[in-house]
């Protein structure tokens, strides 16, 4: 497995070249970029990013030998499962845009977030809408040939790994699978069990750590990697058994305000290295 970090973990004021330099120097093997709202940060992609801008980012990636491993986004909201067709169309356009950027930057996958459950949209309807939103552009996804990872987030959509498996299996595509977020299930479950059940469906992995107050469903807080309730040896073992050999992408924030950006990146890279090395301790 290799070490990656999401660009959200880098201070918003840092430009693309400075970010690539710092992340590489810290010891990472790759980076995940994000499509955000206009001017969200000095290193965000936007829906309006030009070919010239993407070409410049690709040059930086090659200059620092730091591959762009995936394209995430903050723009999904509840669009994919919305009752409004125009919102679902917006979600489809975003997926296609992510795939286009991934193709230009050499990334091997993108992250998408199905959902839409609300007071006005039942879970069943949000699920049906989300499936249709993705299914209707499945041909485009397969033509581009880049992995689309469905992520588990705190939106009450995937409450068990079986929910996630069934959703992915119904889409029935070699290019659609799980973007599994280890930390997002810790409040109510154990990530190693999700990994065992999702198995080979997992194509991308986000890592962060969550400290339970007192067992599951007791609340808690986000903490530094290796400081929470995740049983990392079991997680790494489960990933290994599932055949996962890709990037572990840290999606984390500084918990120490006195820490510099360089210190933070170096710390996270070291934590990831320790996690990956747990393969040999099992």
Regions found by a protein language model. Name each.
Residues 1-103, 135, 173, 212, ...:
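N-terminal pre-domain/capping segments
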Residues 102-121, 144-152, 249:
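Active-site groove signature of glycoside hydrolases
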Residues 39-44, 77-82, 116-123, 187-188, ...:
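A short acidic, helix-capping loop that chelates divalent metal ions and anchors anionic groups
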Residues 10, 249-266:
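A short, acidic, flexible beta-alpha connecting loop/helix-capping segment that sits on the rim
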Residues 2, 31, 37, 125, ...:
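Acidic/histidine-rich catalytic cores of soluble enzymes
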Residues 32, 70-72, 111, 149, ...:
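Conserved beta-strand positions in the central sheet of alpha/beta enzyme cores
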Residues 9-11, 35-39, 74-77, 114-118, ...:
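Active-site-proximal loop/turn and secondary-structure-junction residues that shape catalytic pockets
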């Amino acid at each position: 497995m290799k070490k990656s970090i999401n660009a959200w973990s880098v201070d918003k004021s840092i430009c693309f070249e400075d970010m690539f330099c710092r992340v590489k120097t810290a010891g990472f093997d790759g980076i995940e970029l994000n499509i955000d709202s206009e001017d969200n940060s000095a290193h965000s992609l936007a829906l309006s990013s030009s070919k010239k801008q993407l070409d410049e980012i690709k040059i930086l990636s090659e200059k620092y030998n730091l591959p762009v491993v995936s394209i995430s986004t903050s723009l999904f909201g509840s669009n994919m499962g919305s009752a409004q067709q125009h919102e679902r169309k917006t979600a489809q356009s975003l997926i296609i845009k992510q795939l286009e950027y991934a193709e230009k930057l050499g990334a091997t996958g993108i992250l998408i977030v199905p959902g839409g459950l609300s007071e006005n949209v039942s879970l069943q309807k949000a699920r049906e809408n989300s499936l249709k939103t993705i299914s209707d552009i499945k041909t485009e996804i397969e033509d581009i040939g880049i992995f689309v990872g469905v992520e588990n987030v705190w939106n009450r959509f995937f409450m068990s790994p079986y929910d996630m498996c069934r959703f992915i299996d119904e889409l029935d595509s070699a290019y659609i699978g799980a973007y599994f977020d280890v930390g997002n299930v810790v409040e109510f479950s154990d990530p190693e069990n999700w990994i065992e059940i999702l198995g080979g469906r997992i194509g991308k992995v986000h890592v962060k750590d969550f400290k339970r107050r007192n067992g599951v469903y007791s609340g808690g807080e986000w903490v530094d990697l290796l400081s929470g309730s995740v049983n990392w040896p079991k997680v790494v073992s489960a990933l290994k058994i599932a055949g996962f050999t890709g990037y572990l992408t840290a999606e984390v924030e500084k918990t120490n305000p006195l820490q510099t950006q360089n210190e933070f990146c170096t710390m996270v890279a070291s934590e990831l290295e320790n996690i990956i090395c747990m393969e040999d301790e099992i």
